Swiss-Prot record:
Originating species: Staphylococcus aureus (strain COL)
Cited Pfam families: DUF576 (PF04507)
GO cellular component, one term: plasma membrane
Name of the protein this chain belongs to: Uncharacterized lipoprotein SACOL0481
Lipidated sites in chain (N-palmitoyl cysteine): C23
Keywords: Cell membrane, Lipoprotein, Membrane, Palmitate, Signal
Membrane topology qualifier: Lipid-anchor
Annotated InterPro entries: Csa (IPR007595), Csa_sf (IPR038641)
Lipid anchor positions (S-diacylglycerol cysteine): C23
Localization: Cell membrane
Length: 256
């Protein structure tokens, strides 16, 4: 009888051990899946790339939540900037932000030129108003510099030529999570053979052969939120010299 009791106790302990081990593996699987959740969240917008004609966004609806008022078709905001540091510890940053209102089917925004200084000096910033008609950027402000004027009128957002159809092939990224926000980040090493990298090198003066990092950042619910945001960065930085392209496409209420 004592033998049977000991045997039953042994079986119970083994079942408990397997149950605990199973729970541990379940937690690991859950944590490992965060990378896939981040990619799937980004894919909701990146699958739209390339958006060759930005006016197509007038007919596309994004994630809607309780922040949207009844009848509000929402507004898309597309953004791209290129930042490059120089030897004197200054950072030059140029780019454009465009708001496409689906209610009025109008697109307005601005091109910006910024310079940041390392020392105790406020940054310089200049905005130039633009609008878009027939998928063409129209400069509304007077610009004396012919080179700057050309850059503005010929500007293309990263989302107009980027292609992330193979996003699912990016694996083993470096994932970090801040549960307090919450915010989620994942980083991947890119190849110089990547078509997106080739496109950026052909459009910007990138003085390094270093293969960049793809950085994906999400603030808010992974399932979607009109309050949070997603930001994609392709970082070419080398030896303390910042060189990067930042892109985002967001969908928010147009009516406050």
């Amino acid at each position: 009888m004592g033998y049977l009791k000991r045997f039953a106790l042994y079986i119970s302990v083994m079942i408990l051990i397997f149950a605990i081990a199973g729970c541990g593996k379940g937690n690991e699987t859950k944590e490992d899946s965060k990378e896939e959740q981040i990619k799937k969240s980004f894919a909701k917008t990146l699958d739209m790339y390339p958006i060759k004609n930005l006016e197509d966004l007038y007919d596309k609806e994004g994630y809607r939540d309780g922040e949207f008022k009844k009848g509000d078709k929402g507004m898309w905001t597309i953004y791209t900037d290129f930042a490059k540091g120089n030897k004197s510890d200054e950072l030059d940053d140029e780019g454009m932000v465009l708001n496409l209102d689906r209610n009025t089917r109008t697109a307005k925004g601005y091109y910006f030129v910024k310079k940041f200084y390392e020392k105790d000096k406020l940054p310089d910033r200049k905005n130039y108003k633009v609008e878009m008609k027939n998928n063409k950027i129209i400069l509304l402000d007077k610009v004396e510099d012919p080179n700057l004027k050309k850059r503005i009128e010929n500007f293309k957002f990263f989302g107009q030529y980027a292609n992330f159809k193979d996003l699912e092939n990016y694996n083993n990224g470096d994932v970090s999570i801040n549960w307090n926000v919450p915010s989620y980040d994942v980083e991947y090493k890119m190849s110089n053979k990547d078509e997106n990298v080739k496109q950026l090198r052909s459009r910007y003066n990138i003085p390094t052969d270093k293969a960049p990092m793809l950085k994906m950042h999400i603030d808010g619910d992974l399932k979607g939120s009109s309050v949070g945001y997603k930001r994609l960065e392709i970082d070419f930085s080398k030896e303390g010299r910042d060189i990067s392209v930042i892109d985002y496409l967001s969908y928010k209420p147009a009516k406050k």
